[in-house]
């Protein structure tokens, strides 16, 4: 239970028609009486002057008072909606801070108090920040679905299923003399398999939700004059990179951020890779490799007029040897307008091969679809939810625990070990909603929020 009262501007800094100052805590009513000269009717909008310490009006606007627990934070809350000039907002906040017991809110503290007072769970609290930071319409819709509890509901359903299964398994352990062998009657295995399937579905949705939030990093790499910068320009839809016939034109990393059907895509053009004595070009090549090694996918650009090869190892074995195994590689044969080769995508020795013309944009639509498919993107995200990297990690750990539980059940018929793995899976899932989270984790999450949220 908090004893202090916090205040902050809830709207973004800067000039605007309306600015909102939010107060939350036990002294909210006292603030209202001092600043407004009266106590507004609860949950009714009243148009009132906001007064300074001498009783002179600082501003005038709408005052809204909410009583605990019927507020965003679950505490007494006062919201003052005035004119959105930065000077006016600052004067109003400073006036409120003169009142005893008031202090400035930390970043995310209003949402943190809402979480601590069970007004929303941790995934919903994170969805507030994701909604504010959404970079596309689909990302905003998915964040709203998370805020409304869609993601949390799926997690809670999994936790409840695990709880019921744990009860059944532990009952079998506690009553070993019963005539029925509970662990071998098929119910435990059937329920466990159903939970694992349900978890896999949620993991798939969460991966797409994380994709909408974070996007994927695609690095265009290859030898000089393969058409890397031309592809960057074609994907970006503008002349972002300088394109010439001179090898080594691109000497530094160029970045473009675009959206493909709502999916954030971070495209990085790099210097052509080759042996060179040019010090500046060498630095560019070192930076290129640094980006390649952190990519989600590499587009390996090949000048189709110089070779008919499609196997990257045949084209450049040293490049393939240095590329980290975890990074996906797509071969992009450029200048198909000159070679006249078939544009149909193909699979060659485990690598996708696309034929395009970065100059005329032949085959570019197929490459765009490939990039979306690489991250498991699906066109229909209307019912999706937003997810973060920590959510994916928690889901992955829960899945690993259930795989161990499955082995303990099928191979060893070890009820105690099955129950323990189910408990660990529950803990991992509960981290997502905050039912089982360390103070350090909560601090990191809420400190990343805006002040006033």
From Swiss-Prot:
Binding site for (6S)-5-formyl-5,6,7,8-tetrahydrofolate: 22, 79, 119, 453
GO molecular function: GTP binding; GTPase activity; metal ion binding
Residues that coordinate or bind Mg(2+): 229, 250
Any one GO cellular component localisation term in the record: cytosol
Essential cofactor(s): K(+)
Positions contributing to GTP binding: 225-230, 244-250, 269-272, 334-337
Domain TrmE-type G: 215-376
Signal sequence range: none
Enzyme Commission numbers on file: 3.6.-.-
Gene3D superfamilies: P-loop containing nucleotide triphosphate hydrolases, Probable tRNA modification gtpase trme, domain 1, tRNA modification GTPase MnmE domain 2
Family: Belongs to the TRAFAC class TrmE-Era-EngA-EngB-Septin-like GTPase superfamily. TrmE GTPase family.
Protein task: Exhibits a very high intrinsic GTPase hydrolysis rate. Involved in the addition of a carboxymethylaminomethyl (cmnm) group at the wobble position (U34) of certain tRNAs, forming tRNA-cmnm(5)s(2)U34.
Record's protein name: tRNA modification GTPase MnmE
UniProt organism field: Aeromonas hydrophila subsp. hydrophila (strain ATCC 7966 / DSM 30187 / BCRC 13018 / CCUG 14551 / JCM 1027 / KCTC 2358 / NCIMB 9240 / NCTC 8049)
Gene responsible for this protein: mnmE
